[in-house]
Curated annotation (Swiss-Prot):
InterPro entries: aa-tRNA-synth_I_CS, aa-tRNA-synth_Ia, Anticodon_Ia_Val, M/V/L/I-tRNA-synth_anticd-bd, Rossmann-like_a/b/a_fold, tRNA-bd_arm, tRNAsynth_Ia_anticodon-bd, Val-tRNA_synth_C_sf. This is Valine--tRNA ligase. It is found in: Cytoplasm. One of its GO terms (biological process) is valyl-tRNA aminoacylation. The gene is valS. Keywords: Aminoacyl-tRNA synthetase, ATP-binding, Coiled coil, Cytoplasm, Ligase, Nucleotide-binding, Protein biosynthesis. Monomer. It catalyses: tRNA(Val) + L-valine + ATP = L-valyl-tRNA(Val) + AMP + diphosphate. Its EC number is 6.1.1.9. Residues 800-831, 898-963 form a coiled coil. It comes from the Bacteria.
Length: 968
């Protein structure tokens, strides 16, 4: 623990401080949730990361915001629960373990399901604590005693219970639907696990012969444009727009499907006929205006098929090879090899009209990179739009409808509000949710089958056997091989993590939770589903507010991806990393290994010396400053350096305060009412000013928390500490301590301590480590802590503005003082005086103010003296030839001996040079050819040079105008 009497170290070294306070906070139990009556409740759920994953920048950003909210609530006296958990992450975790086995020459099928699942559990135990250790490194004040894993027995029981109840309510069913199919993983995947990017492809124009030539036009065929010739084997129709004058008269007729001969694809006699249909889905301007319809392999075609009652033909196997339902000519061939053969055969038959280059969006599995195939398979679904039966909490209303009403009725608030439209649009167009996955790792679906295919859905195998026996079946039953979508268990977290289905005190206190902090990319996949499931099973909304933040991207706005080599590891930003290991990290696991040289080149340019250690506080402050309401967060690590400098500034300011208050009379026992020149405490305008500004900052910070504007919080704290407290008040305080009366000195020391102690409490939710370390030193001195090391800053009261302490008169006084000091500094700069060169300043104007301000101006302006005149003429005479500054009603003369003629000549020469540079710049920028052809950065640089030249010219012209008039 901190010894408050031990002097503060000379420099801020974050590593040791972070390690010390992480351990101390856990030992003190500062994050342990309380359930006290009469106190407000605050709850926040950690979006459960992959149990075997590692912390990425999105996690670190998200957790900075959540920790700021949790610490703020805790300091405001709320029963605060931050629920931690990790997700089993079915696909991601299974892939990792399968790759480990592949390296040993073993497949999961060699092991069998039970042994493979055991291997996954082993991997979970080995690596499962990595991410929680990394979360701790960020300073997250989480109640780790309540940590769950989505496949813990309690969580698994809740999952089974929900599945069974939904099935019994008729809201879960099994059916054949089109899903995203990853042929490498051999499972359905969610939309979130599909990445669609533009790729170069082709548009094949294929002639489909009309079953009967068109008597009206003599047309013998329709030309169909497609990007996927291989799926034409499963075509069941061609369609045109019903208002397309070229083809509308053909609706109801038929074409013969090329290459559809069952035994011989090229035998035209075997080709089957398919209808020509009309549908407004067709874009008349795309391709030829005629589109093939393949409901078994295209989501849009599936919807068309449903509207028109068309059959569904699957011509691909689950391994993405041509199936036995297709012509024998192509069976067993890989889909892309089949594409090549089909194109050749069409060309042979004279049915390939043309091939055009075409850019299209190609869906790929984010884990495998393989092209995703829409596939008709038997899957389990949750009915999203079906009315719930009697006996449920919302009978007659669908799950989606109830979730829509929760936001529209104001029970859930989305911040910013723009995301309400996104939420509503998705729920208004929702499809039934495919919840089954063809994996071995995950919650196995609680359904069993007998030999006749009858299904028994139950919480346990014993229950399933009892159901089977009740129906007269006494033979063996087999459990469904599939597991549930990871998002299914994640959707239950708001209530399952609090002990549901048991009726627990935690559910009473913390459901609904106060706020959910999440990226906009999972509004559909997680947020909406939590709303649906929580309302359906508890009648409560899962959370009162959803704070939707942007996604962390690199400094150029590109998505961070390990496969692209542009990721940053938050722990590397905290601890630092040398260049060589950083290069290894960034060039390993690239999606395109050939990109490694470019990634290395970019990394060497961006981080020539590796990444320095910034510490967790600097990283957190950077994240907070970037937390705007925009869609993207472009992360530039150079900003961390600025916030590391802020931490150093705060550290050094604290050292100054302690050195000037330790062992001194700080007036803490004096009554503040006993103030004034004759009292025990005499607060100056500067003292009252900094306290007044502090109230304004406290108000701004509180509004920032209320509005979830962490960027405003960070900005307010930064500006107050750096610009006002450090740059101005500490300098003014030095003067007061050196020249003031005992009452003024006591008041100054008291103000230094009390303002600093308040600032440390104010900034603690954003930068917890450094503020805790400094508070342990400052608080006892400020009379705010016992000083025995048993108290934590995290448990103190959060500052609240006292509006009565706002002193506009003092603010105005210091504003005038700042203007005087700035004017004096400008005069020194214009006259090129060195800091060591001390000269007198003559002043005339508001004599009372100038007299009071003189000690400050002398010290901060590095002057030998400040002489205040009541007679303007006398000042002009004494300061003849001195440079002048006018500040409001006050006139300042910097008494300096100069060679007027030489200075005039020097300034004139520089002015002439600048005018010449301006002419050159204006000539360049006035040249249309230069502006049009030069890179934007070059033009921008030239514009900046012109602006700088003009600004400098203005200063020099003002400076030469102030020189005394030369007489012959």
């Amino acid at each position: 623990m901190t010894d408050p009497n031990q002097s503060l170290a000379k420099s801020f070294e974050p590593a040791a401080i972070e390690q010390k306070w992480s351990a101390a906070w856990e030992a003190m139990g500062i994050s342990r949730a309380t359930l006290e009556a009469g106190r407000p409740d605050f709850c926040i759920q950690l979006p459960p990361p992959n149990v075997t994953g590692t912390l990425h920048m999105g996690h670190a950003f998200n957790q900075t915001i959540m920790d700021g909210l949790a610490r703020h609530a805790r300091m405001q006296g709320a029963n605060t629960l931050w629920v931690p958990g990790t997700d089993h992450a079915g696909i991601a975790t299974q892939i990792v373990v399968e790759r480990q086995l592949d390296a040993q020459g073993i497949s999961r099928h060699d092991l069998g399901r039970p042994a493979f699942v055991d291997k996954v559990w082993e991997w979970k135990e080995q690596s499962g604590s990595t991410i929680t250790r990394q979360i701790r490194r960020m300073g997250a004040s989480i109640d780790w005693e309540r940590e769950y894993f989505t496949m813990d027995p309690k969580m698994s029981r809740a999952v089974s219970d929900v599945f069974v109840r939904l099935y019994e309510q008729g809201l879960i069913y099994r059916g054949k639907r089109l899903v995203n199919w990853d042929p490498v993983l051999g499972t359905a995947v969610s939309d979130l696990e599909v990445v669609s990017e533009e790729e170069d492809g082709a548009l094949w124009h294929i002639r489909y012969p009309l079953a009967q030539p068109d008597a009206k036009t003599g047309l013998t065929h329709l030309t169909v444009a497609t990007t996927r010739p291989e799926t034409m084997l499963g075509d069941v129709a061609v369609m045109v727009h019903p208002e397309d004058e070229r083809y509308a008269h053909l609706i109801g007729q038929a074409v013969r499907l090329p290459l559809s001969g069952e035994a011989d694809a090229l035998d035209t006699a075997q080709w089957r006929e398919i209808p020509i249909i009309g549908d407004e889905y067709v874009d008349r301007a795309f391709g030829t205006g005629v589109v093939k319809v393949t409901p078994g392999h295209d989501f849009n075609d599936y919807a068309v098929g449903q509207r028109h009652g068309l059959p569904q033909i699957s011509v691909l196997t689950l391994e993405a090879k041509i199936a036995d339902t297709a012509p024998a000519t192509y069976r067993g061939i890989d889909r892309f090899e089949a594409r090549k053969r089909i194109v050749v055969d069409l060309e042979t038959l004279g049915l390939l009209a043309e091939v055009k280059k075409h850019t299209l969006m190609v869906p790929r599995g984010d884990r495998t990179g393989v092209i995703i195939e829409p596939m008709l398979t038997d899957q389990w679904f949750v009915a999203m739009s079906k009315p719930a039966p009697e006996g449920t909490r919302f009978p007659g209303r669908s799950i989606a409808e109830v979730a829509l009403d929760a936001v529209q009725g104001g029970k859930i608030k989305l911040v910013p509000e723009q995301w309400v439209n996104t939420y509503n649009q998705w729920l208004n167009n929702i499809q039934d949710w495919c919840i089954s996955r063809q994996l071995w790792w995950g919650h196995q679906i609680p359904a069993w089958y007998d030999e006749a295919g009858n299904v028994y859905v139950a919480r346990t195998e014993e229950e399933a056997r009892a159901q089977a026996a009740a129906k007269g079946h006494t033979g063996a039953i087999k459990r469904d091989d599939d597991v549930l979508d990871t998002w299914f268990s994640a959707a239950l977290v708001p209530f399952s993590s609090l002990g549901w289905p048991a009726d627990t005190p935690e559910l009473k206190h913390f459901l609904p939770s106060t706020v959910l902090v999440t990226g906009y990319d999972i509004i559909f996949f997680w947020v909406a589903r939590m709303v649906m499931m929580t309302l359906h099973f508890t009648g409560e909304v899962p959370f009162q507010t959803v704070y939707v933040h942007g996604l962390v991207r690199d400094s150029e706005g590109k998505k961070m991806s390990k496969s692209e080599g542009n990721t940053l590891d938050p722990v590397d930003l905290i601890d630092g990393i040398a260049l060589e290991p950083l290069l290894v990290k960034r060039t390993t696991g690239l999606r395109r290994p050939k990109d490694a040289p470019n990634v290395e080149k970019r990394t060497r340019k961006e981080f020539p010396d590796g990444i320095p250690a910034f510490g967790a506080d600097a990283l957190r402050f950077t994240f907070a400053s970037l937390a705007t309401l925009g869609r993207n967060i472009n992360f530039d690590s150079s900003r961390c350096e600025g916030y590391r400098n802020f931490c150093n500034k705060l550290w050094n300011a604290t050292r100054f305060v302690l050195m000037n208050t330790e062992g001194q009379d700080c007036g803490l026992q004096e009554c503040v009412g006993d103030c004034g020149p004759e009292g025990a405490l005499h607060f100056s305008p500067a003292d009252r000013w900094i306290v007044s500004l502090l109230q304004r900052v406290e108000t701004e910070v509180e509004k920032g928390f209320a509005d979830y504007r962490f960027d405003n919080i960070a900005s307010a704290i930064y500006k107050f500490v750096w610009d006002e407290y450090c740059d101005w008040y500490l300098e003014l305080a030095k003067v007061q301590i050196q020249t003031g009366t005992p009452a003024q000195q006591r008041a100054t020391r008291r103000t230094l301590l009390r303002v600093l102690e308040t600032v440390l409490r104010l900034a603690h939710p954003i930068i917890p480590f450094i503020t805790e370390e400094l508070w342990q030193k400052v608080a006892p001195m400020a009379g705010r802590a016992k000083g025995d090391g048993t108290e934590s800053l995290a448990q103190q009261e959060y500052p609240r503005a006292v509006l009565a302490k706002i002193d506009e008169q003092a603010e105005q006084w210091v504003q005038q003082l700042k203007a005087l000091v700035d004017a004096c500094r400008n005069l020194r700069g214009e006259m090129s005086l060195s800091p060591a060169q001390r000269v007198p300043l003559y002043a005339h104007g508001d004599a009372e103010f100038l007299q009071a301000a003189a000690p400050y101006v002398q010290a901060l302006g590095k002057l030998s003296e400040v002489k205040v005149y009541t007679d303007a003429a006398a000042m002009e005479q004494d300061g003849a030839g001195a440079p002048v500054a006018i500040v409001g009603e006050n006139k300042l003369l910097l008494k300096i001996e100069i060679d007027v003629a030489a200075e005039h000549a020097r300034l004139s020469k520089e002015i002439d040079r600048l005018r010449g540079e301006i002419v050159k710049c204006e000539g360049k920028l006035g040249n249309e050819s230069f502006v049009a052809r030069a890179p934007a950065a070059v033009v921008e640089q030239e514009q900046k040079r012109l602006a700088d030249f003009k600004a400098t010219l203005g200063k020099l012209e003002a400076q030469i105008a102030r020189l005394p008039v030369q007489t012959a």
